[in-house]
């Protein structure tokens, strides 16, 4: 019986269709499809070779399928990692290169690196010696033993096989080889430099030997700062500020506080009325004198004090012709004449109804 691998299968392909396709060259014992690839078991080796020769790159539902003999990897094979491969290199060319040193069971290219499985370990060692750091298709490739394995748990590996060094008998997290590929030796150097290895965290923070000895001064400073920032200190500061405010308010004059309180509590005052605050002594006398002077100045102003509305203002009396005028009354006569002229002009100007002619002018 020969097992064949069928790759790049279309979604429309069925097991019955694949079986009937391979039965043209021999008896098919088994046919299995797994996603986009499958396996076919043919009884005769000659029939299997004919199927590979005729069905490889056969177009099925518009897709070229791949047919080749299935390669069972031997348990004793040696896996090599080949890095820095040319992007134009193919599996067949890389396989032929390594077959110069021994039989190759499997060859897989992944981007710019590949994995080559060789049947014998001595052939793999010879391939490393002969091909590592050599030119192949214009690029210098690197060949070394592969340390990658299938991990049973993330970051753990397996006791039966470490994925870092490939050896058995220890977990991957306990491997002496670190991630960079170097052997880590942290037993004696760590103990000599830092003393005893730290025990698990059984004590609370701050009580451990590793914090108090090294950071004693810092711990004392932290305690002082914490005491200064305590709740009692903040409360005392707030109380002192409150006492200072009360003492300052108590020093204000009692009379001023009483007058202000009466002014604020009075309900008969106009909210828009502006009054001067009560003062005492010379300040009150000066304020009264200033108010009286302002009143006299306003009364003596003829232009701004005069009401210019003809409706609210009374007409000034016009002197008669029979009245005589003596020396010293020219100023009074001139003032009366000016008042008469202004009043007559204003009356002639504002006597007519302002809104009577609105209808006549609204048409324009």
From Swiss-Prot:
InterPro entries: Euk_RNA-bind_prot, Nucleotide-bd_a/b_plait_sf, RBD_domain_sf, RBM4_RRM1, RBM4_RRM2, RRM_dom, Znf_CCHC. Changing residue 115 to A: Abrogates regulation of alternative splice site selection. Residues 196-364 are annotated as: Interaction with TNPO3. There is a cross-link at residues 79, 92 (Glycyl lysine isopeptide (Lys-Gly) (interchain with G-Cter in SUMO2)). Phosphorylation on Ser-309 is induced upon cell muscle differentiation. Phosphorylated. Phosphorylated in vitro on Ser-309 by SRPK1. Phosphorylation on Ser-309 is induced upon cell stress signaling, which alters its subcellular localization and may modulate its activity on IRES-mediated mRNA translation. Disulfide bonds: none annotated. Residues 2-72, 78-148 form the RRM domain. One of its GO terms (cellular component) is perinuclear region of cytoplasm. GO terms for biological process: cap-independent translational initiation; circadian regulation of gene expression; circadian regulation of translation; enteroendocrine cell differentiation; entrainment of circadian clock by photoperiod; insulin secretion involved in cellular response to glucose stimulus; IRES-dependent translational initiation of linear mRNA; miRNA-mediated gene silencing by inhibition of translation. Expressed in the cerebellum. Expressed in neurons and glial cells, including layers II neurons in the frontal cortex and CA1 pyramidal neurons in the hippocampus. Expressed in heart, liver, pancreas, skeletal muscle, placenta, primary fibroblasts and peripheral blood monocytes (at protein level). Ubiquitously expressed. Highly expressed in heart, placenta and skeletal muscle. Weakly expressed in pancreas, kidney, liver, lung and brain. GO terms for molecular function: cyclin binding; miRNA binding; mRNA 3'-UTR binding; mRNA binding; pre-mRNA intronic binding; pre-mRNA intronic pyrimidine-rich binding; RNA binding; zinc ion binding. It comes from the Eukaryota. This is RNA-binding protein 4. The lineage of its organism: Eukaryota, Metazoa, Chordata, Craniata, Vertebrata.
């Amino acid at each position: 019986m020969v097992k064949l691998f069928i790759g790049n299968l279309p979604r429309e392909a069925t097991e019955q269709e694949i079986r009937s396709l391979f039965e043209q060259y021999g008896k098919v014992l088994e046919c299995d499809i797994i996603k986009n690839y499958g396996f076919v078991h043919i009884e005769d080796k000659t029939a299997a070779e004919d199927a590979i020769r005729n069905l490889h790159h056969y177009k099925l539902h518009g897709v070229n399928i791949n047919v080749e003999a299935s390669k069972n990897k031997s348990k004793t094979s040696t896996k090599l990692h080949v890095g820095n491969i040319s992007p134009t290199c193919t599996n067949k060319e890389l396989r032929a290169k390594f077959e110069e040193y021994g039989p190759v069971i499997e060859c897989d290219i992944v981007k710019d690196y590949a994995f080559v499985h060789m049947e014998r370990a001595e052939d793999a060692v010879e391939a490393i010696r002969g091909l590592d750091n050599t030119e192949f298709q214009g690029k210098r490739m690197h060949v070394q033993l592969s340390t990658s394995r299938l991990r049973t748990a993330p970051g753990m590996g397996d006791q039966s096989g470490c994925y870092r060094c490939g050896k058995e008998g220890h977990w991957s997290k306990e491997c002496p080889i670190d991630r960079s590929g170097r052997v880590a030796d942290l037993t004696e150097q760590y103990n000599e430099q830092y003393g005893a290895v730290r025990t698990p965290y059984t004590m609370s923070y701050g009580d451990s030997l590793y914090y108090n000895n090294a950071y004693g001064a810092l711990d004392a400073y932290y305690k002082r700062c914490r005491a200064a920032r305590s709740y009692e200190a903040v409360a005392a500061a707030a109380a002192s500020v409150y006492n200072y405010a009360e003492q300052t308010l108590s020093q204000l004059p009692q009379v001023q506080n009483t007058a202000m309180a009466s002014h604020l509590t009075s309900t008969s005052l106009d909210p828009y009325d502006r009054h001067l605050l009560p003062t005492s002594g010379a300040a009150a006398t000066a304020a009264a004198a200033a108010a009286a002077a302002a009143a006299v100045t306003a009364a003596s102003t003829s232009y701004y004090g005069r009401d210019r509305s003809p409706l609210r203002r009374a007409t000034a009396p016009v002197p008669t012709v029979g009245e005589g005028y003596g020396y010293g009354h020219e100023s009074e006569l001139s003032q009366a004449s000016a008042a008469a002229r202004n009043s007559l002009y204003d009356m002639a100007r504002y006597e007519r109804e302002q809104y009577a002619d609105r209808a006549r002018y609204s048409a324009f």
